[in-house]
Structures are given as C-alpha cells and as structure tokens.
C-alpha cells in the first residue's frame, strides 16, 4: 500500500499512529498544543481575552494547514464531527467588550461553538464546572441501576454486587480525579448514586442509615 493503513489488521492502530506522526510537525509550527488518541486529535491554544479575535484568525490558518497535510497523505478530515469550544470563566466572558464568533470554518463545514464537548468519555463544559459531566454521569448510572433493579429478585447478593460494580461503580470511578475541587452539591449527587447502589445490593430500606452498609461493601 502506498497510502493508508490495512483495515482490520492487528497492527492497524499502531501503524496508524506511525502514519500520522508527522502531523504533529504541522501543528507545532503554529505553537499549538495537541493531543491525539488513535484517530482523534485535539488542538488547544490559549490567549489573553483581548487577543481572542486574533486567535480565531490564526486558528483558521492552522486548520487549513492540517487539511492540506491530510489531503497530501490521502486522509480525510471529518468536518461534520469536528467540535470547537472556548473555555473561560463565566465572569471574564461577561466582561469582554466583544462577542465570540458563532462558528469556525472547517473545510466546507461551519462548526458551531459548543457549550460542552466529550473527551474520552468525560464531558467538559465551557467553564470547566463539570456540571454537565456529573449530570450525564448520574443519568447513565441511574439508568443502569433501574435495569439491574428489574431483575434483582433473580440475583444473589454477590451477583448483584458484581453487576453494580461493573455497570455503575465503574462509571463513578472513571476519571474521578477530575472532580477534585468540585462544589459539594455536585459530589452529593454522585454520593446519592452510590448510596442507591448499596441499597440495591443489600436490599436496604431507604430509611436505614447507609454508612455502615457502605463500609460492609468496602465502598
């Protein structure tokens, strides 16, 4: 093969990383931070508030350079799946004397600025409050608890604990270090999910104090 990576091969992911390694050279010449995971690449650029308009102009330049590199290497940038977000404190955003553009142009697509984006399973909002991530996490964990609850009468305690650990606690544990410093009311929402999980496993009444039961489960 002159271009690309053989699909379905065992070495495919490794070969793809090697194949796209030179992309970092194109990005770094613009002094842009970047992170890549398989075929997912993220670009990050910081600037003082008064330089935001210039930042958008330079952003368009290195996006065009990336597309040129991909065309040269017979790769296609998925314009429709590209996301963009401005991260700032809410207070500073409100104090700016100008408004942010509504979108950036990527190829033939106009990519609107998002209030939140998902990065490897973690949802980041534009003010890094983690509110959206916690809300999504609580919703998905409660959904799994309801599914397990519907068959709880068929399961032993150990089997229920295994299912809860696999489908609920694993979600709470994933990247939980990012929640350090979050307001207590957000952490309380996650604690409530864990409490409900313990009640489901041990068939504990809602009126019972949950701390001893969490300790017995080593949670």
Task: For each feature predicted by the language model, list its residue ranges.
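Active-site palm subdomain of RNA-directed nucleic acid polymerases
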Residues: 13-44
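Catalytic palm subdomain of template-directed nucleic-acid polymerases
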Residues: 41-67, 71, 89, 180-181
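Short, charged alpha-helical motifs in flexible N/C-terminal segments and linkers
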Residues: 67-86, 92, 189-219
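Short, conserved micro-motifs composed of acidic
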Residues: 61, 72-115
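Mobile genetic element proteins and their domesticated derivatives, centered on retroelements
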Residues: 8, 23, 39-41, 59, ...
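Basic, alpha-helical interaction scaffolds
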Residues: 108-179
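Short, conserved non-catalytic motifs in the polymerase core
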Residues: 1-15, 44-50, 126-127, 149-156, ...
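Charged boundary/loop elements
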Residues: 65-66, 72, 79-80, 172-187
